[in-house]
Amino acid sequence: MQGLVILDKNDEVIRPAILWNDGRTVKETNYLNEVIGKERLSECTANIAFAGFTAPKILWLKENEPDNFAKIDKIMLPKDYLAYRLSGCFCTDYSDASGTLLLNVKNRCWSKEMMKICDVREEQLPALFESYEVVGGIKTELAEEFGFTINVKIVAGADDNAAAAVGTGTVGEGGCNISLGTSGTIFISSKDFRVDENNALHSFDHADGGYHLMGCMLSAASCNKWWMEEILKTEEFDKEQENITKLGENQIFYLPYLMGERSPHNDPDARAMFIGMSMDTGREEMTQAVLEGIAFGLRDSLEVVRSLNIPIRRTKICGGGAKSQLWKKIIANVMNLKVDVIESEEGPGYGGAMLAAVGCGEYENVQAAAEKMIKVVDTIDPDMELVAKYEEKYQKFRQIYPAVKGLF
């Protein structure tokens, strides 16, 4: 998940992992985008640099911790470190490798040019597998320690968002999944490789063997958690939402950029704000504005998808925020999409289990697993009157970030 784990020649961890949401690499990200150039990056990897990607972290390490950089024998992503300890296999999967900015996404191989730019050797990078492929078996001593048989297989696994997409059945051509987790994503599965003109969306390999486009918000449910727990000092999320009934009429706006933003702005300096309060504004209006602001932020990425003439009419939804019936209704009307709720609430974990089932031969492929294991239990239809109200509000929302960008 784009975090950086580095081991020395003795397989000892050199330093604490630098996580996906670490913002220290602004300088390195700017160097990649401005000096190396976005066009060149896109040609090599199908993406431009974002502060959370792994390559900027490697450059930061080289500049700021040269002694640690010199010790690197293996470069890993967090989940792959666990697989390495369990099986001894130094590997990763294509979906997770896509976020390193070291992978040629279209051709599913490490980019020699990006390795040169980051001063990385191919032997320092893990072997590449499809997410559903078996990479090895559990070590005998660990099988004994955990009480497992030695026949336990280790499957490559996937990036959290790709796993969530599999776990909601978002595979094949034209599937859509919205994840309302700590971060928020809108994920479009595809059989064909695609890149948007401005690289506003991530263009990654998918865990089903195909490709996907993804818009990523750094703060989604975490915005709601911050508002509820830090500002309102409550953990009763449902109670705070139960009196919100006048959808589409609230004129308070919230920019959901607590930790900067990725898609589509790629601005680590962006910050959150409320706009439009008056003496009549209360906590219900502010709470509603937070939920709507996150939905509008995801809509920004959906607009990029629509600009590519990809027809999206419905979406799956997962993540902790998807437990809120109100939020799902807001999403349906802001996006003008049918929102399908699946039986399992554990998108990424369920998707990981599905990939393991394919790897162990229970299903022929990921599509077949999805057809058998995914069940839609509810659908929220958009209300065209609310769609019209939210369309008007969204057009105002999208003017705010450009207007205040210079203040950050």
Task: Give the label of every model feature segment.
Residues 118-130:
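A conserved helix-loop-beta module that forms one wall/lid of the active-site cleft
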Residues 15-29, 342-343:
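Short, acidic/small-residue loops that bind anionic groups at enzyme active sites
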Residues 1-20, 48-52, 83-104, 127-130, ...:
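Short beta-strand-loop/turn "lid" adjacent to the catalytic site in phosphate-handling enzymes
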Residues 26, 33-91, 101-112, 116-119, ...:
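Active-site core segments that coordinate phosphate-bearing ligands/cofactors
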